[in-house]
From Swiss-Prot:
It holds the Pfam family Vpu. HIV-1 lineages are divided in three main groups, M (for Major), O (for Outlier), and N (for New, or Non-M, Non-O). The vast majority of strains found worldwide belong to the group M. Group O seems to be endemic to and largely confined to Cameroon and neighboring countries in West Central Africa, where these viruses represent a small minority of HIV-1 strains. The group N is represented by a limited number of isolates from Cameroonian persons. The group M is further subdivided in 9 clades or subtypes (A to D, F to H, J and K). The keyword Transmembrane helix applies. The lineage of its organism: Viruses, Riboviria, Pararnavirae, Artverviricota, Revtraviricetes. The modification Phosphoserine is found at residues 54, 58. Keywords: AIDS, Apoptosis, Host membrane, Host-virus interaction, Inhibition of host innate immune response by virus, Inhibition of host tetherin by virus, Ion channel, Ion transport, Membrane, Phosphoprotein, Transmembrane, Transmembrane helix, Transport, Viral immunoevasion. This is Protein Vpu.
Amino acid sequence: MDIVQQVGLLVVLIIELVIVIVIWVKVYKLCKEDRRQKKIDRLIARIRERAEDSGNESDGDTEELQDLITEGDNLMHIGIRDNRNN
């Protein structure tokens, strides 16, 4: 192999590496959002269940849900968007 082929091969490998990194970052963000949404769904279900059982909502669960929603709003302000709305 001459030097031109080696440089070309190196450029191709670097481009592939960048593509792989971009894909994995996107997958990580989607998984993180999915886990957050599942946690919110569980909290909502627990609040509803407790409201049906006792006639009122649990303040702790409601506060935790509010914290998660606020965290989601903060993430949207820094550029991470909810893909389900797109």
